[in-house]
Structures are given as C-alpha cells and as structure tokens.
C-alpha cells in the first residue's frame, strides 16, 4: 500500500538563490511599504518568480532600489535592498495521479 501512495504523486522541491535580485531594472527594495520589511518583501519577490516563499534573505544599504508592490523608487541614503534572496517551492506532479 505504501508503494501505491508513493507512486500516486510526486512532490518536488525547487530552490533558487537570487543574488542582487532586480525588479523592473532596479535592485529589489527590502520593504513593501513602511513597516513591512524583510520577510514580507522577500516572499513577494519569490512569488513573482513563481516560488512559494523566501527561505533566507540578506539586506544591504543601497542608494537606489524599487519596491515590488508599488514600483516606487527609493533613492536616498536610507534605502535598503536585498543582497540575496533564496526562494523555495514545492511542486506536485498531478499527472502522476492519473491511473
């Protein structure tokens, strides 16, 4: 019975690292809006790339970056962009469920 469960469908994990990730030609801002920085913005970036969520991320100060939600450019001394975002997804092969 266990063999039948295993062959009924497969789940495949997908992981990808994005170094200096960009959105619309600019580095990705580490904030969606004020107060929603870090994980929410990293998750939004990963979802745009077709992944479920961000596993890890690193930030760095940068003179210019773009917010994913609004496309707004931050161009001041206090901008923070992602240096790296590692995205993760689990894909299920539905074709394997057919008899």
What is the meaning of each model-derived region?
Residues 1-4:
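Sec-dependent N-terminal signal peptides
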Residues 6-10:
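N-terminal signal peptide c-region/cleavage motif recognized by signal peptidases
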Residues 11-99:
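Secreted/extracellular ectodomain signature
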């Amino acid at each position: 019975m266990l063999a039948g469960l295993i062959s009924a469908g497969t789940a495949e994990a997908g992981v990808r690292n994005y170094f200096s990730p960009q959105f619309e030609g600019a580095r990705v801002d580490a904030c969606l809006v004020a107060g929603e920085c870090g994980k929410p913005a990293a998750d939004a970036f990963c979802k745009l790339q077709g992944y479920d969520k961000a596993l890890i991320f690193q930030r760095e100060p940068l003179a210019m970056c773009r917010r994913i939600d609004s496309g707004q450019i931050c161009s001041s001394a206090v901008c923070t962009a992602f240096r790296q975002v590692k995205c993760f997804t689990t894909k299920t092969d539905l074709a394997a469920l057919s008899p």
